[in-house]
């Protein structure tokens, strides 16, 4: 039996993907059956971190070592990730959501539709307010765009109004939100998005 939803979380290195996965797990684990697959190039660091902080029970977390280009393992040849997801779904037949966190990649990264149903793409303010207008599949076609670390805008000279304008122009009607995952600001918007995607919402 497959889970109700396979949700990809992608974005550049350091944007806050693992922080978002951790926050979603902590907030939803008491009302949904969750599992996580993480991707790292040569380690299982993100999986080990999520286990160490107790985001979920260890047996619900799988770490995939992709080697080479991280986008290949979520797009061109996603077999290693698909196997990890299917293993979790066999072990936990009542799963509601499997979160698949990609390795850190560039703005061109995207998930294979064979691997996930929907994708959240995470960027961060520290990379500069020009990022939304640079485009790329993550910016323009992800199901939800998360612009994280808004608390750093004043320190890096990023203009949130410019980011808002450019994001709206690039995405049209597709949803997006600002977050500061360290404080929890904006997390409710992400959780609302996820819950709205479930066939039978709790």
From Swiss-Prot:
The keyword Methyltransferase does not apply. CDD domains: UreG. One of its GO terms (molecular function) is GTP binding. Keywords: Chaperone, Cytoplasm, GTP-binding, Nickel insertion, Nucleotide-binding. The keyword Nucleotide-binding applies. SUPFAM superfamilies: P-loop containing nucleoside triphosphate hydrolases (SSF52540). GO terms for biological process: urea catabolic process. GO terms for cellular component: cytoplasm. It is found in: Cytoplasm. It comes from the Bacteria. GTP binds at residues 11-18. Pfam families: cobW. HAMAP family: UreG (MF_01389). Facilitates the functional incorporation of the urease nickel metallocenter. This process requires GTP hydrolysis, probably effectuated by UreG. Belongs to the SIMIBI class G3E GTPase family. UreG subfamily. Homodimer. UreD, UreF and UreG form a complex that acts as a GTP-hydrolysis-dependent molecular chaperone, activating the urease apoprotein by helping to assemble the nickel containing metallocenter of UreC. The UreE protein probably delivers the nickel. This is Urease accessory protein UreG. The gene is ureG.
């Amino acid at each position: 039996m497959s889970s109700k939803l396979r949700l990809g979380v992608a974005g550049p290195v350091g944007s806050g993907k693992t922080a978002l996965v951790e926050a979603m797990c902590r907030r939803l684990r008491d009302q949904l059956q969750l599992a996580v697959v993480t991707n790292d190039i040569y380690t299982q660091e993100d999986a080990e971190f999520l286990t160490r902080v107790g985001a979920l029970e260890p047996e619900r977390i799988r770490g995939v070592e992709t080697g080479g280009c991280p986008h290949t393992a979520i797009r061109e040849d996603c077999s290693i990730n698909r196997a990890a997801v299917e293993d979790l779904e066999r072990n936990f037949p009542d799963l509601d959501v499997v979160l698949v966190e990609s390795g850190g990649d560039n703005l061109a990264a995207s998930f294979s539709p064979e691997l996930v149903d929907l994708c959240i793409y995470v960027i961060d303010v520290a990379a500069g307010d020009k990022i939304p207008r640079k485009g790329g599949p993550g910016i323009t076609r992800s199901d939800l765009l998360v612009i994280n670390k808004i608390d750093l805008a004043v320190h890096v000279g990023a203009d949130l109004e410019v980011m808002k304008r450019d994001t709206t122009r690039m995405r049209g009607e597709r949803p997006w939100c600002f977050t500061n995952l360290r404080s929890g600001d904006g997390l409710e918007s992400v959780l609302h998005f996820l819950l709205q995607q479930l066939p039978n919402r709790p």
